[in-house]
Amino acid sequence: MNKDLTDLYHHKAEEMSTMLVSLRNRSRVFILTEIGSFLVAIGFVVLYTLLDNAAWTLFCALAALLFYLYIRRRDVLNDRKIKTAEALQRVYQNEIDYLNGNFSGFEAGEQYVNPQHPYTFDMDVFAAGSLFQRMNRTISTGGSDQLAACLSTEWGSAKREELIRQIRQRMVSVDELGKAEPFLSEFKSLGVKERINTEEVLKALTDVHRQSFPKFFHNPLLRYFCYADLLGFYVSIVLSVMGLAPSLLPLWWGIFNFMFSFLCGHKHMRVISELIAKVHTQVDGYLRVLKLVNKTEFKSAELQALKQKLAGAEESFEQLELILQKIDNRSNEVGVFVFNSFALIDITIVRLFLRWQHTYEQRTNEWIDSLNLFDALVSMGNFRLNEDRAVQAEISEENKVVYEAKNLYHPFLSEKAVANDFTIHDHEYYIVTGANMAGKSTFLRSLGINYLLAMNGLPVFADHLKVSLFHLFTSMRTTDDLTHGISYFNAELLRLKKLLGSLRDDVPSLIILDEILKGTNSLDKLNGSRLFLQYIAERNVTGVIATHDLELSKMEEEYVGRFHNYCFEIELGEDITYSYKITKGVARNQNATFLLKGILNPNRI
């Protein structure tokens, strides 16, 4: 556990706690002051009715009312600070829990679990305690989907150069965000109270863009007519006050404005109100994210490009907020009459909406996609910050399987994890034997999950790891499916069939298998495993296979230079000693009988 980082999170959480005490005390003072100033204003109004020549009391009442409005504004701002501090306190506490091994405060990504995926099911990428849950700090459903998509990518495409360039760019982005702690916490705090529902936003924005209005509102002459009408209206007021025009002229003109604007625009304005109201809270969340991103300077090419793609988004969402504010201003009968008479507000709202629709129709989806990626990158950067024991991998450009690891271990294990050196050569196969619980499966998962991290530009858990770009497929956790009448053995065959179907001769592949054909008898399992490995060895494939079948290790003698034996050995004595170190050779000791004797006769052990 990173003690310095833990101390930092504790310090920040305590700082927020102290700030909250101060802000809440201030809030109570503001409330009492608001009540007092409002009562004082009423008192001066009462004095005005009781005293003669008491015009001064009206000025005092006005002053008290202005003071009330000032304090009210301060109270609103103070309340925002309280909400921000509460959110940050929750963020810091969540990170403290994470460093202590408690991930319950983060979504596990159960919806992304897919037993048919080439590797995510076997590598514990999703579900409780998974890599996703440890990494996920997204504040939007779209960001969560984007992070899941990154962790589920199937590599090995023919566009190797472009993919390698993107991975290296991602490494720089992740490293930069991993050092941007104040930014990370502030970003994460924006999703504490309520996550942004990206699907709802996209659906509502689609409805917004599809909404059509009569050609009348698109006519440029309408704009000039409105300008001329309002100019004439205000001039009539001035002339009426000066006695140069009939006193009723402004009144009748105002009534005309109200009728014209209300009858022409009210129905359409209500449609706009309903459309925008659907996304108001979500858009407000995106607006806060955009303000934070836009005020932050980034150095990496990927982050700068993302920020550039978001140009205009903040202004766009602010305009939506402005339209909604104008709708709120005319939300009662008095507002409807006043704002339509003096500003033709219903027509103005429709025209503002049309202008927004025309200006930003083609860009909103791109902005949402960019924000989703930014959201996912913040989670990756936060993982980089928390896991400072990890290092960035070296990406090889060779068009073959390259996997050279120095002191590699599984990221889910503590810092006391036993690390292993291991090198995988292209077109070669590694048979790993060993007793139960000796470390075979954990080692296989260490190979797979660290490759997954490297391909996403994330730090790996090793002193050094050099990998190339290749297709990864695993078969470690096959399950039966009684609902569809699929037995365990049949499920294994289907998994191997899917493996074969995923292979391409022009793309190097690494397969990681744990106990092939577990669902059959020992001899059949051995013969079937040999047959499968003999066939697969003719393809552009490299493999690491864990097995209890010691006979399978004889393939090293039959295919010299192609098959290699490695093992996790145990020492049997009064107790069992597990080294968890991989060595060359074939395992000599097994522990099933030893452990079973301990269960049947506990006094023996």
Predicted regions and their residues:
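Alpha-helical coupling/stalk and coiled-coil linker elements that connect catalytic or binding modules
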Residues: M1-A435, F443-L472, L494-R495
